[in-house]
Amino acid sequence: MVVGRAIDKFKNLPEKDKHKYFSTILGNNHFVLLGAVGPDYPYLSELKNNILKLHSWADRMHYENTGGFVIEGIKNLQNLKDKEEFRVCLPWLCGYVTHLITDTVIHPVVNAIVGPYIFNSTEHRHCEMIQDSFIFKEIKKVEISYTEYTHLIKMCSEDDRGNINPAIDSFWTRTLEMSHPDGKDKFRYINPDDWHQGFLSKIELASNPIPIFRHMGEEANLAYKMTGSITDHERSTYTTDVSFPGGKKGNFINAFEMAVDKVIEVWGRLFE
């Protein structure tokens, strides 16, 4: 939801704040959405192929050399500047950065509410899914649905088999290899085509809104609550009277908008 809100606000920036790649990012915003799912993408494939417990590229993208990935991604973009692939990979990297920023801003808030993830993973998932439903209704004024987002992500497919755009395949693979040089023995598990196909199959089979941007690989039958089903306790604890780091209290939407504003700031600075 952060990425969708950021795109909407990015469109309305004053002319003086629009950098030279403004039209490239917005003109291919389906690749921004794809990048925003990027660090979560491998989970479904890793579960299916029974390699999650052995090694996880999804975990590496979340917890290992995250800044290094962005740095190497920018280097790779420099080599694509005069090529058509640049118009695809730039918005994708903007989306990827969005995911990292959102985690940096939102996770400390969730930790303050339910405790550290390592000891409270179920509570984390429940808290974040309530927050997703709440924010979607607050911003969009309708119940949570990813129909629009999933349609846009399908536009990132290269063919009917569900293969990912080849520019993204190459860029993502190369950037992972460059930012994780000690993972050479696991490079064979880098497979954006398989990750993309696994994601598409998951959302096409779902009959209810599912957490496609978070927790994709954690449980088979997760589904969001509609806001009318959120209890008073859940609403207060997770959305309207939440605990912030440092002992402060406030509305979760303030943390959400902080993440959105930071994303827009970084998009503006990333390629100056």
What is each of the regions a protein language model found here?
Residues M1-G95, L100-E272:
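N-terminal leader/auxiliary helical segments
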